[in-house]
Amino acid sequence: MATSIKDVAREAGVSIATVSRVLNDIDVVNEDTKKKVLDAIKELGYRPNIVARSLKTQRTKTIGILLPDISNQFYPEIVRGAEDVSNIYDYNIILCNSDLDIEKEKEYLRVLKEKMVDGVIYMSSSLRDEILELINELDLKTVLVETRDKDGVLPSVTIDNIKGSYDSTNLLIQKGIKDIAFIGTKKDNMNAWGDRYVGYEKAMNEAGIKIDPELLYLDSIKVKSGYEGIQHFLGLNKKFKGVVCASDDIAMGAINALRDNNMEVPKDVSVVGFNDNFAASIFYPKITTVSQPTYDMGSVAMRMLIKLLNKKELDEPNYVLEHELIERESTI
């Protein structure tokens, strides 16, 4: 016969109401009592009736995670951090991949609402007005990762992308390199990838180096943009000694293009990336990059969301984590 909540209460020596409070993460239960209940649940192998509990509490203990590109190595580690925290608090996850398609994002948000998720972690480099409006319209408790809304209403977890790109550009400048190209996306308000162009621009301006518009290739953050960007510069017969890339994928594409044109990295051209994907550390040459604490971004975002769901005040609604510039073979 299946273990019941009464069995758990009897084993822990508490009331059924106390077991219910522990299951629903209500703060009035002290830590010693909570431990007794959790130990009893583990000992007896008790599995609560999710449907019955959701009908009673109006909560499903389910959180939706919406990410833009599951093939990008940057996002899975964020999901892992979020999932580890969700497991601690007994939340399930529904994972949605939009493939950088805003219409798919909208549809997934509607589906998550229909699934009665308790909240959403929204990952993207930017937050478009129509997505923000839909989140508000659907009344979805949401924490943003890698982006922020312009009014600062939704809680967010990011790094300082401007400072990260500034640091990587400045590394090349300190090595005496002045002809520095940039491959990424256009400057755009509230856009993490666009912020990386702003950081490049700021470092160049502060160093008194004029930016050559023909050494800008503003397309996407994918590998092909890195490859096509280098081919574009070479097609214009441009001379450059450094390339700042808005992602490690771009950097890998750029290095491959340079190699195909018989140019050595870093002997002929130094290349810096952004994100510190695993591939950046094993690519040849190993890529100098701005490392983001991706696991921490996911775990912090999930903790923030669970706090919101429990009607607790956030210590810091817009959390900015530290980045690290890691120098490897592509600039040494």
UniProtKB/Swiss-Prot annotation:
The keyword Transcription belongs to this UniProt entry's keyword annotation: yes
Presence of keyword Ribonucleoprotein: no
GO MF assignments: DNA-binding transcription factor activity; transcription cis-regulatory region binding
Source species, domain of life: Bacteria
Keywords: DNA-binding, Transcription, Transcription regulation
Ranges for domain HTH lacI-type: 1-57
CDD domains xrefs: HTH_LacI, PBP1_CcpA-like
InterPro entries, sorted: HTH_LacI, LacI/GalR-like_sensor, Lambda_DNA-bd_dom_sf, Peripla_BP_I
PROSITE patterns: HTH_LACI_1, HTH_LACI_2
PANTHER family named in the record: HTH-TYPE TRANSCRIPTIONAL REGULATOR EBGR (PTHR30146:SF149), LACI-RELATED TRANSCRIPTIONAL REPRESSOR (PTHR30146)
Function: Involved in the regulation of amylase production.
Protein name: HTH-type transcriptional regulator RegA
Organism: Clostridium saccharobutylicum
Upper taxonomic lineage: Bacteria, Bacillati, Bacillota, Clostridia, Eubacteriales
